[in-house]
Regions:
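ABC transporter nucleotide-binding domains
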Residues: 1-141, 145-148, 154
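Alpha-helix N-cap/helix-start and coil->helix boundary motif
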Residues: 44, 140, 181, 222-223
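Residue-level marker of positions within ordered structural domains that often coincide
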Residues: 55, 95, 179, 227, ...
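Short, surface-exposed beta-strand/loop "edge" segments at domain boundaries and coil↔beta transitions
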Residues: 101-106, 180-184, 207-212
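ABC transporter nucleotide-binding domain
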Residues: 117-203
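C-terminal coupling/interaction segments
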Residues: 191-239
Length: 239
């Protein structure tokens, strides 16, 4: 999938991607941030082609997914809008029975309605307990509701890797009441920011009982946690 070997070892589904690429690609589906489809073909020709070359492609399922869009099967790929191109590509990918689905900025080019519909379809039409979906995206807030695990990376280095369940237990966000701001800060938050003029403090491995009397406590949104971890990592590098 374009990864460059620098150090260490890598296995995907128990296979070495460098030695067992042919076997691996039978079990892996991948969509990049740019949908590349033959522009001279019609939509129907693309579907027939994929049906002929990929043994795990389910044409009927693809047509069902495609029927929820405004894409006509008689249309040439070259006349499709960017959003339609992505929808067509995703319809094909989601109709392939693969154990691992890798999505790189999958909703790039789609408007808000289609982005929400896509993730809803992803869970309803593709995911089951035997499949894994790996999503690489900068639009963190869009995928929070479908995540089971999260990996934050900064300049090629993993700075956080944990389950969402564990993250929600480990990190807490406090909006302290005005009278308790200084007391809250004395508990050593790992990050703080202003939101509409109000202090928001992020704590790691701090008991909720120590915070609950100081203001409003809740697990942070993934996007807010991401920004906080990136800022914290940057300061550590610069120190």
């Amino acid at each position: 999938l374009g990864l460059i070997n620098t150090e260490g070892n890598l296995e995907v589904l128990g296979l070495d991607p460098r030695k067992d690429r042919h076997k691996l690609l039978k079990e892996v589906c991948y969509i990049t941030d740019v949908a590349v489809l033959p522009k001279w073909m019609t939509v129907n020709q693309v579907l027939q082609y994929v049906d002929g070359v990929h043994p795990s492609f389910n044409l009927e399922k693809c047509l069902t997914i495609l029927s929820r869009t405004n894409i006509k099967r008689s249309s040439k790929v070259r006349v499709l809008s960017r959003g339609m191109m992505v929808q067509l590509h995703l319809s094909i990918v989601m109709a392939i029975d693969a154990k691992l689905l890798v999505l790189d900025e999958p909703t790039l080019g789609l408007d808000l309605v289609y982005r929400k519909e896509f993730y809803s379809q992803l869970i309803e039409d593709y995911y089951d307990g035997d499949k894994t979906i790996l999503i690489s995206t900068h639009q963190v807030e869009e995928i929070e509701g479908v995540l089971s695990d999260a990996v934050f990376m900064n300049q090629g280095r993993v700075v956080l890797h944990d389950s969402i369940e564990s993250i929600n237990k480990k990190f807490l966000e406090l909006r302290p009441n005005q009278d308790f701001i200084e007391k809250a800060k004395s508990l050593r938050p790992i990050h703080q920011r202003l939101e509409l003029g109000r202090e928001v403090l992020l704590f790691e491995d701090t008991e909720i009982d120590k915070l609950s009397n100081l203001g409003e406590v809740r697990p942070p949104f993934i996007a807010d946690l991401f920004m906080a971890i990136m800022d914290k990592t940057k300061k550590e590098i610069e120190a």
